[in-house]
Amino acid sequence: MDTASHEMLNLLKTRRSVRAYKADPVPEELLDQVLEAGTYAPSAMGRQSPILIAVTSPKYREQISKLNAAVMGTDKDPYYGAPVIVLALADPAIGPWVEDASCALENMMLAAHAL
């Protein structure tokens, strides 16, 4: 197995869900790289329909957290205090929008792990 293949498989094997975050802001350069990874995700018929929005403002992050918690029927922060929330918006009229957004999010999770 070549080095790139080995590194990719290792990345997939070692990625974990995180539920404890530092309060430090994410450097813009890293955030841009993670968002860029989302744009390389596969999508139905190559439409690249998901729109990715990084919410870095503490004020808006808190508002979105409260709205999502209410939808989930809880008062706990569904983002576990992460300093950035990435929203993947997709038009339900355009193909399998949930799957397209999910692929973009997975690419971003792998990129964040790699960085």
Named regions from a protein language model:
Residues 1-115:
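Acidic, surface-exposed loops and disordered segments
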